């Protein structure tokens, strides 16, 4: 797959040249492939939020560059607004940014600013609402009458209605109850499967990352600590733990079984994979 986004030797320093100078991102480099579901994980202060604000030009690099389809997004600063339509960013707790009188108007705000009108705008709004499970009868309600999870869906629909090529989600399930988290992630998985768009999911939850993404980028102290397929990353579980990061609950169980002498792959990260291995061991096989 060809990369749709490329981060090249990115550095961002806050307060440069002052006694309070601090680098939030240092010499980060990685590619994001077209149609990929990429997970980014790291502790608070690891550089996650600063990094993703560079992906659509909300922040300008101190050094390095961001390429969108091979072109530096800052090559023509006057066109940075176009980049923000192509790389949609949903902030943590986006429901706090809702402001219109109705759900419909809130979802319509972004595509209307793109120049959509009439039937084209109406289709964009209703299609985005449908993608995240908002019913037609909810479109004329005030967004402030909705539950927290429903507000989150409205905010997400407002970005989807602009039809971004890349969707960046910053802790999209933060503050939701377990049912709300799973319902929202199901909407996001359906969107990825049906539309084939590139998604970047930022989370502090290894379990959420493990269940959803194709590849993982692990950040620590403003640097990329490791990256790879989930099985490759979780195979380095001890390294993740020693770095103060977490592993999925299933991986933790597998690691403990391995320590107790069970012949099992400690990098498994799904219930199904662990079940297959345990059944294979019970039958005298090797399991995989």
Residue ranges of model-derived segments:
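Catalytic Walker B motif of ABC-type/P-loop ATPase nucleotide-binding domains
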Residues: 167-170
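Conserved ABC ATPase "signature" region
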Residues: 120-137
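ABC ATPase NBD Q-loop/coupling interface
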Residues: 65-82
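A short, flexible loop at the N-terminus of ABC-type nucleotide-binding domains that lies
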Residues: 1-4, 13-27, 77-79
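Conserved ABC ATPase signature
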Residues: 142-146, 150
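Helix-to-loop junction immediately C-terminal to a conserved catalytic motif
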Residues: 56
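Conserved catalytic motifs of ABC-family nucleotide-binding domains
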Residues: 163
């Amino acid at each position: 797959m060809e990369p749709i986004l490329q981060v090249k030797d990115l550095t961002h320093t806050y307060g440069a040249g002052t006694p309070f100078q601090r680098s939030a991102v240092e010499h980060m480099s990685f590619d994001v492939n077209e149609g990929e579901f990429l997970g980014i994980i790291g502790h608070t202060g690891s550089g996650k939020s600063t990094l993703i604000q560079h992906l659509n030009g909300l922040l300008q690099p101190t050094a390095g560059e961001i390429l969108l389809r091979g072109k530096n997004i800052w090559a023509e600063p006057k066109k940075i607004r176009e980049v923000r339509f192509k790389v949609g960013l949903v902030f943590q707790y986006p429901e706090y940014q809702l402001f219109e009188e109705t759900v419909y108007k809130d979802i319509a705000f972004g595509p209307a600013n793109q120049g959509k009108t009439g039937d084209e705008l109406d289709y964009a709004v209703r299609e985005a609402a449908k993608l995240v499970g908002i019913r037609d009868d909810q479109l004329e309600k005030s967004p402030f009458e909705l539950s927290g999870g429903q507000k989150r869906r409205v905010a997400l629909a407002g970005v989807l209605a602009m039809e971004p090529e890349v969707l960046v989600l910053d802790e999209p399930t933060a503050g939701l109850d377990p049912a709300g988290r799973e319902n929202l992630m199901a909407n996001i998985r359906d969107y990825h499967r049906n539309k084939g768009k590139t998604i970047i999911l930022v989370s502090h939850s290894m379990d959420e990352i493990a269940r959803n993404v194709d590849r993982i980028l692990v950040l620590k102290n403003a640097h990329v600590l490791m990256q790879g397929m989930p099985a490759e990353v979780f195979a380095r579980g001890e390294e993740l733990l020693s770095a103060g990061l977490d592993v999925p609950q299933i991986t933790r169980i597998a690691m403990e079984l391995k320590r107790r002498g069970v012949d099992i792959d400690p990098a498994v990260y799904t219930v199904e994979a662990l079940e297959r291995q345990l059944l294979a061991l019970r039958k005298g096989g090797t399991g995989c």
